[in-house]
A protein has these predicted regions:
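ATP/NTP phosphate-donor binding region
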Residues: 1-95, 344
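Glycine/threonine-rich beta-strand-loop-alpha-helix active-site module
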Residues: 79-182
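Carboxylate- and glycine-rich phosphate/diphosphate-binding segment that chelates Mg2+/Mn2+
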Residues: 153-261
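Flexible, glycine/charged-enriched surface loops at secondary-structure junctions
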Residues: 210-219, 234-246, 261-266, 318-324, ...
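Gly/Pro-rich interdomain helix-loop hinge
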Residues: 276-353
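Short, amphipathic C-terminal "tail helix"
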Residues: 350-387
Length: 387
């Protein structure tokens, strides 16, 4: 096999496993932090002895002063970043600690960008548009899904246009990521299901991406295998530590894969559902994934056949196309087994919005690495199939 040149980005330091949270204080010290802005949401902050309380304990034990911003919303908004930036500046913070899933991590990255770059955040949408270093970011992760703790992506919603935009830059990479599966124990089944399908979407889209390489393929394949074997158990019994740990590892691998291979039409389309309808990102991905997979199947049937086998399907004796079809069946069955809604019509989506969402999806940065190039009519048709 002939390899083209490729690069591979990951955060500087990653800690994984039970009680990994215990390193957060010392790691902030090593980053030179004196006063941290802890970015989270009100729900996480309210949990007694939860991830926020544990993070605060270890930060204070290390002598790090802390200011808290808990105004992060799902599908974080540019207004959340503005409010968090005000706290960052008022409290004269020099390091950002994000605690939660993708929303706090992306909001924290946005605060870092706004603190070091002039003008509206939207003007930095795109790839490698940032010119200045951000404050150090230490990302404490509590969900197995978005993997924002290990990626260069910052996804925010423009509240005026209701469009999600993505700022992709190596400068967004957290200096430290912490994945402690003990912080994921007891998360609600619906959240576990949605974030788990987000992780699966990351792995599948990275694997079939035009920008995939041998290293991203290896990470994506193992992520798909782990998710197929553990997501049902994590949803059924939230206290199953082995399933939680395997899902956390799968999410980490999927994040490292798409951080380098990029994504595709599932995410480009899901961002429109999140922007217009504030739909949970994992749910949007889960509903769209089988339909986009069917559209992409002819672009790389061999890899879809691999996905089928990784998900436990018996493809012995089948043609490549028949084996590839089994991947779509396996994805759909997993989604149904864990209680994900199967149709956009059940989630309040309006058919009249499909042409606009299709137009905007093709402008989304994730669209450019999709293995099959589509047009607005084809993307609108995929929305209708998912409806």
């Amino acid at each position: 096999m002939s390899y083209r040149m490729f690069d591979y980005l990951v955060p500087n330091v990653n800690f994984f496993g039970p009680n990994a949270i215990s390193v957060v204080g010392e790691r902030c010290q090593l980053q030179g932090g004196k006063k941290a802005l802890l970015v989270t949401d009100k729900g996480l902050r309210a949990i007694k002895d939860g991830a926020v309380d544990k993070t605060l304990h270890y930060l204070r034990e290390a002598g790090i002063e802390v200011a808290i911003f808990d105004g992060v919303e799902p599908n974080p908004k540019d207004t959340n970043v503005r409010d968090g930036l005000a706290v960052f500046r008022r409290e004269q913070c020099d390091i950002i600690i994000t605690v939660g899933g993708g929303s706090p991590h992306d909001c924290g990255k946005g605060i870092g960008i706004a603190a070091t770059h002039e003008g509206d955040l939207y003007q930095y949408a795109g790839i490698e548009t940032l010119t200045n270093p951000l404050p150090p970011i230490v990302a404490v992760n509590t969900t197995a899904g978005t993997a924002s703790e290990v990626t260069r992506h910052c996804v925010l919603t423009n509240t005026e246009t209701k469009v999600k935009f993505v700022i992709v830059s190596w400068r967004n990479l957290p200096s430290v990521s912490i994945n402690d599966p003990l912080l994921m124990i007891g998360k609600p089944a619906a959240l576990t299901a949605a974030t788990g399908m987000d992780a699966l979407t990351h792995a599948v889209e990275a694997y079939i991406s035009k920008d995939a390489n041998p290293v991203t393929d290896a990470a994506a394949m193992q992520a798909i295998r782990l998710i197929a074997r553990n997501l049902r158990q994590a949803v059924a019994l939230g206290s199953n530590l082995q399933a939680r740990e395997n899902m956390a590892y799968a999410s980490l691998l999927a994040g490292m894969a798409f951080n380098n291979a990029n994504l595709g039409y599932v995410h480009a389309m899901a961002h429109q559902l999140g922007g217009l309808y504030d739909m949970p990102h994992g749910v949007a991905n889960a509903v769209l994934l089988p339909h986009v997979a069917r559209y992409n199947l002819i672009a790389n049937p061999e890899k879809f056949a691999d996905i089928a086998e990784l998900m436990g399907e018996n493809i012995t004796g089948l043609s490549t196309l028949d084996a590839a079809e089994k991947a779509i069946a396996a994805i759909t069955r997993l989604s149904m087994d864990i209680g994900i809604p199967q149709h956009l019509r059940d989630l309040g989506v309006k058919e009249a919005d499909f042409p606009y969402m299709a137009e905007m999806a093709l402008k989304d940065g994730n669209a450019f690495s999709n293995p099959r190039k589509g047009n607005e009519q084809e993307i609108a048709a995929i929305f209708r199939q998912a409806f």
